[in-house]
């Protein structure tokens, strides 16, 4: 339900089409799911709602690193798998989207211990920095407490999510159903991203959305439409109703619309699919698990401008940074909720949320093309305690609240705190213009991604609970979801569906 793909010229796509799989959402995960499902031979239609909904990932940089800040093995595996797969995806699509600048995690020894353990187990090369002096010697633009330690690696970096989605879309549509080649803006995209040696290009100097589409019904394609409901009746093919009056029919529908999934599932009246012996059983969505357990958190990011000279000299080799700025604050993320409505799932402590509350992430200077923010080089910082939306509101109010938040400029108080942390961390950097941006994350009590089957026979698969860190490893997450999708398609075929 979010976006960066193609316009519908010169060929208009029929309003009703039939595909093996319809993916609602053309963000980092949705585009990856679509590409990997297409690679298995299925026909795919991606519904891209960028004209009606604002996405949280719509930025120039998202971190991806070989460690997970909370030391979770599944997230680390996705990080590593995605990092390994980036070169092939970039080569096949002709789109450069990954900047390999390394990553750094800095905090108390106890805070860094779990990531170090996971890096060691995964066989990832890293450097240990024994105190604040060692950190500052290696990274002279940083200033951290003497009691802090750090671990750094050379494998991590950041992705430009808009370019990564382009790459996924191009490869998906090159892998057209029936072994026919369908390209979308391929040649133009290759020209836009061919300057590999240019530092501006390497760090994100182009939005580069597709300019044209030549995909037809029943081939792999992206359509600029808005999903308003998903219909899944027993014994019938599921389909997605669009605001444009069309229907995208499929054997299976994947919901990958980020913050909008929960509202879409509820307004569609979808039920959860559970196993009862050898049969599927439909039950109401459970607020303690799966999609219904997702909580939406308002997030604010700060973009701090630096001069082009500083970006390309002093800070040229700066890694991404995860920094524990408040070691004494160790309560769970949900303690900071502004919602009066609570459930057991909502009040339980999340390791991820607790970690976020006491830490920030920082990206090295990235060149933003303008106009918002104005063209220039910016260091980005975000993190801190969650600020949850009210769970009591109905689906329409939730979507409207999301629209209003994403149309604003974030929380000024949070931005002020982020600025204080950034200046303390990088006191020798001359920051110029400050720009605040809104973001939203989908959180769960256990900090894990949610993949849930909905509707009769599990014909709808919902993916959510990204915890604010799924854009970087989205390729591997998409591959994992695609495996489940393909397996479900095989089960349907076995039943004669």
Which residue ranges define each predicted feature?
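Beta1/beta-strand and adjacent pyrophosphate-binding region of the FAD-binding site
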Residues: 13-29
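Conserved Rossmann-like nucleotide-cofactor binding loop
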Residues: 29, 52, 260
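Flavin-dependent oxidoreductases
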Residues: 32, 65, 232, 241-420, ...
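Glycine-rich FAD pyrophosphate-binding loop
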Residues: 38-57
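Dinucleotide-binding Rossmann-like beta1-alpha1 core, especially the glycine-rich loop
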Residues: 61-138, 147-149, 359-360
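Helix-loop-beta segment of a Rossmann-like dinucleotide-binding subdomain
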Residues: 94-105, 117, 128, 132-176, ...
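A conserved short coil-to-beta-strand element within the FAD-binding core of flavoproteins
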Residues: 183-188, 215-238
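C-terminal catalytic lobe of FAD-dependent flavoproteins
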Residues: 418-497
């Amino acid at each position: 339900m979010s976006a960066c793909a193609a316009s519908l010229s010169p060929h208009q796509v029929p309003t009703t089409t039939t595909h093996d799989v319809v993916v609602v959402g053309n963000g980092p995960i949705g585009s990856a799911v679509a590409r990997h499902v297409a690679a298995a031979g299925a026909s795919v239609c991606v519904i891209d709602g960028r004209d009606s909904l604002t996405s949280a990932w719509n930025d120039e940089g998202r971190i991806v690193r070989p460690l997970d800040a909370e030391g979770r093995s599944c997230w680390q595996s996705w990080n590593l798998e995605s990092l390994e797969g980036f070169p092939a995806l970039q080569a096949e699509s002709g789109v450069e989207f990954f900047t390999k600048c390394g990553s750094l995690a800095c905090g108390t020894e106890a805070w860094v211990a779990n990531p170090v353990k996971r890096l060691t187990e995964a066989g990832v090369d890293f450097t240990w920095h024994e105190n604040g002096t060692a950190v500052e010697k290696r990274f002279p633009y940083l200033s951290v407490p003497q009691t802090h330690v750090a671990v750094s690696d050379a494998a991590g970096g950041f992705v430009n999510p808009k370019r990564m989605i382009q790459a996924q879309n191009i490869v998906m549509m090159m892998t057209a159903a029936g072994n026919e080649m369908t390209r979308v803006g391929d040649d133009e995209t290759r020209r836009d991203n061919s300057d590999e040696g240019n530092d501006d290009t390497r760090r994100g100097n182009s939005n580069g959305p597709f300019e044209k589409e030549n995909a037809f019904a029943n081939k792999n394609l992206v359509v600029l439409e808005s999903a308003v409901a998903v219909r899944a009746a027993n014994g019938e093919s599921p389909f997605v109703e669009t605001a444009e009056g069309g229907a995208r029919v499929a054997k299976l529908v994947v919901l990958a619309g980020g913050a909008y999934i929960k509202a879409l599932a509820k307004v569609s009246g979808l039920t959860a699919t559970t196993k009862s012996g050898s049969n599927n059983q439909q039950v109401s969505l459970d607020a303690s698990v799966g999609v219904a357990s997702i909580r939406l958190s308002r997030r604010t990011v700060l973009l701090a401008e630096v001069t082009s000279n500083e970006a390309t000299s002093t800070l040229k080799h700066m890694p991404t940074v995860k920094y524990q700025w408040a070691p004494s604050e160790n309560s769970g993320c949900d303690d900071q909720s502004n919602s009066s409505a609570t459930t057991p799932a909502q009040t339980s402590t999340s390791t991820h949320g607790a970690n976020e509350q006491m830490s920030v992430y920082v990206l090295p200077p990235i060149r933003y093309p303008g106009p918002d923010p104005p063209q220039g080089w910016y260091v980005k910082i975000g993190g801190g305690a969650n600020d949850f939306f009210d769970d009591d509101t109905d689906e329409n109010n939730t979507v409207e609240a999301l629209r209003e938040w994403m149309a604003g400029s974030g929380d000024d108080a949070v931005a002020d705190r982020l600025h204080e942390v950034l200046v303390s961390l990088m006191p020798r950097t001359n920051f110029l213009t400050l720009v605040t941006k809104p973001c939203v994350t989908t959180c769960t009590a256990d900090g894990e991604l949610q993949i849930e089957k909905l509707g009769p026979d599990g014909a709808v698969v919902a993916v959510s609970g990204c915890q604010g860190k799924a854009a970087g490893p989205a390729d591997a997450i998409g591959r994992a979801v695609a495996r489940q999708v393909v397996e479900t398609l095989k089960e349907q075929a076995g039943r004669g569906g």
